[in-house]
Amino acid sequence: MEFNLNTLTNHMKRTVFPLLFLTIILLGHGQSMFTPKDAILSDGDLEFLKTLTETIIDSSRIYPGERVADQMGNNNTGGILVKPGGRGSYPAFWIRDYAMSLESGFISREEQRHMLLLTASTQADRTWITKNGALIPFGAIADHIRMDDGLPIYFPGTYSFEEQGTPEFGRTPPYGDQFLFVHMAFYFIKTTSELTILEQKINGTSLMDRLEIAFNVPPSRLEDHIVTTTDHFRGIDFGFRDVMTITGDLCYPSILKFKAALELSELFEKLNNQQKADKYQLIAGKIKEAIPLLFMDERGMLKASTGKGNQPDVWSTALALYYDILSQVETEKTSRFLSQAYENGHLSYKGNIRHILTTDDFDESTAWEFSLAQKNTYQNGAYWGTPTGWVCYAIAKTNFKLAQQLAKEYIDDLRQNDFRKGPEYGAPYECFHPSGHTQNPLYMTTVSCPLAAFGNIVKP
């Protein structure tokens, strides 16, 4: 066969140029336009979110000796801390935000070890009363820990060890941190298989014992282990609504307790302690059975509580579906209702989620019944990215295409307002509102929580 260079060149042009043109078109439109039917996000959008999350977590690191705010001193804890976000916001180590971000996969083994043992070392070693009259029970876990002197602050609203515990933030520490402490240990074991850390003594008490003590700190109903509170002994139900007053039986911390019970059961299985493993399985089962009976309304929404603030709660509802607490019938009912609320514009804005549907506001002046924040700001009606993945998971149970749409709106807003574009940009924000209200740029759980949840969404 005669070799003809011109013929070969022309053939290559006919083959390569159309492919090149198609590639340019695809790149011009962006990978994010093309989402596989069975994936919640396109490959391009998922990679964007992973990279952004890794960048945000890196910007949230406080290295030994580093200072991020003049009044807070240097990091003298002996290891890296991860605060709730980048730039100057929240200059301390918050247990909650850190624990909720672990499943992003971007926290190293040594970083985990340091923050787990630091949290354990600041667990309350006695019951005491603050100068403001709040009670810190034996075994309580800090809300946040100072970086300069390592002192635990058990209550929101302050960085002062001496001034903590004012009435507006409860008379006992928030309930969620105890269960998230369990999650920190569980995730460390899950990712390192280093079981010996559970036997390590911290100030004379093993880590495993500390986990059990913490688990039993929040007050609970005797019959079913549901977390409960009263006006007199009120604790914050969960730190992402710490400017609200919510009383009675509490849904969100009970969901966290359910998850922590399963995690303790699995840890005891690994330690060959079947009796304890069975005990915590039983506790989880009782909580799972009680939650819909106590909190579910006729539409399938879970209310935040049975006392003050007993309003349908999007975050509790979505997280309960995410943790497989509801039955199949309940799940489908709730999923359809959330889908309808999303389509009607009552649930989200630019892919971010309200605590309460706009149709469920307490009245014209406030979203929550009792709030320290003005309506449509912060936790009282602004929109948050933290629960977006859980809500997508819930909606996907009955309408996968709609879940994809919500996820796409979330990614599109992150792309549009990506802080890497310049100092006037700040996404991921902690929360925002159509009025123009924004709060705390470069916020970690806004990307870390959805990233983890998106990885668990499969098309039914």
Model-derived features with residue positions:
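Active-site core of glycosidic bond-cleaving carbohydrate-active enzymes
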Residues: 48, 93-126, 202-212, 251-270, ...
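Bacterial Sec-dependent N-terminal signal peptides
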Residues: 1-33
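Short amphipathic coiled-coil heptad-repeat segments
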Residues: 290-295
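Secondary-structure edge/capping motif, primarily at the C-terminal ends of alpha-helices
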Residues: 188-192, 265-272
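Low-complexity, Ser/Thr/Pro/Gly-enriched N-terminal "stalk/linker" regions
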Residues: 31-96, 113-118, 127-140, 460
